[in-house]
Amino acid sequence: MTIPSGRYSKPLQLEKNLSNALPLTSVAPCRFWEALSGICSRTLQHPDSQVNRLCITPDKRYLAAAGHTNVKLYDIKSSNPNPVMTFDGHTNNITGVAFHCEGKWMVTSSEDGTVKVWDTRSGSLQRNYVHKAAVNDVVIHPNQGELISGDRAGTVRVWDLGESVCTHQLIPEDDIAVHSVSVASDGSLLCAGNKKVSGNNFRRL
């Protein structure tokens, strides 16, 4: 991935015509709502904690609900209201979740200062990357071989999954927490968003 100009050191998109919407909630459970009628069509049990982030697999089969210390995976096409798999390993709130393009693995970020990669078939932990501060967000690069994460210390890190190392460390603004990261679909542009005084500042890195 080419990193544009900036300070660095080198080593819910909705589907068109969507009929259901899933809100984030500070209390369990998760609910499916019919977007046009406003009727709650289904409820999923999430008893352990609040729900921080939601993500649907690319094949629209599963829903991941990230809570306090774990992620629960639900079968969307099943009538079972309980999770079919639970991913345990974080020690604080989970702040980000994303799926590989074929749903083979999942990545999570957490206030415990780590980014973790999970095998969605076995539920096992495959990678563990450490920040020096709470991590607010993580995304997968379109090449599926890199992760980009942002933390409360104001650092954006690029992780190479093949080599299992941090290849770039970027600092949009010193000591200003990075709340959100996003990468263009062709991988040509990486953006980070922070909150400084009032409003959000987005910077091209």
List each language-model region with its residue ranges.
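Residue-level detector of Asp-centered blade-edge/turn motifs that repeat once per structural unit
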Residues: 16, 58-59, 101-102, 142-143, ...
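Per-blade loop-tip surfaces of WD-repeat and WD-like beta-propellers in eukaryotic adaptors/scaffolds
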Residues: 3-9, 32-49, 68-92, 117-135, ...
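Cationic, amphipathic, low-complexity alpha-helical segments enriched
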Residues: 1-3, 12-18, 24-25, 205
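C-terminal closing repeat unit and adjoining cap/tail of repeat-based domains
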Residues: 188-189, 205
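Conserved strand-to-loop turn within each blade of WD40 beta-propeller repeats
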Residues: 24-27, 65-69, 109-112, 150-153, ...
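Hydrophobic packing within well-folded, soluble alpha/beta domains
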Residues: 30, 54, 94-97, 106, ...
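Canonical WD40 repeat/beta-propeller blade segments in eukaryotic WD-repeat proteins
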Residues: 10-11, 17-22, 49-55, 92-98, ...
